[in-house]
Amino acid sequence: MAKQSMKAREVVRVKLANKYRAQREELKAIISGVNSSDEDRWNAVLKLQSLPRDSSPSRQRNRCNQTGRPHGFLRKFGLSRIKVRETAMRGEIPGLKKASW
């Protein structure tokens, strides 16, 4: 199990990313825009750098919904590989069965 503080930190990152999403997209559009002047681009870069670090979506980490485990995460189920196996063996995931050949 992951520490509660790590799970809470991840929740804060998601909230910050949602809060600053529009502002971040506007600034990136100015930076990558062909019609923007160099001065406007530079000011947009400075504003982008002044945003909170955790507001960047790339700082988010996929974690297991049950345990908070960051590695072995399966997006389809929202669980780690260990929890997917446990729930599949109990038959709690519809349509998923153990492979045999």
From Swiss-Prot:
Residues 52-68 have a biased composition (Polar residues). GO terms for molecular function: rRNA binding; structural constituent of ribosome. Keywords: Ribonucleoprotein, Ribosomal protein, RNA-binding, rRNA-binding. Residues 49-70 are annotated as: Disordered. It holds the Pfam family Ribosomal_S14. GO terms for cellular component: cytoplasm; small ribosomal subunit. It comes from the Bacteria. Binds 16S rRNA, required for the assembly of 30S particles and may also be responsible for determining the conformation of the 16S rRNA at the A site. Part of the 30S ribosomal subunit. Contacts proteins S3 and S10. HAMAP family: Ribosomal_uS14_1 (MF_00537). Belongs to the universal ribosomal protein uS14 family. This is Small ribosomal subunit protein uS14.
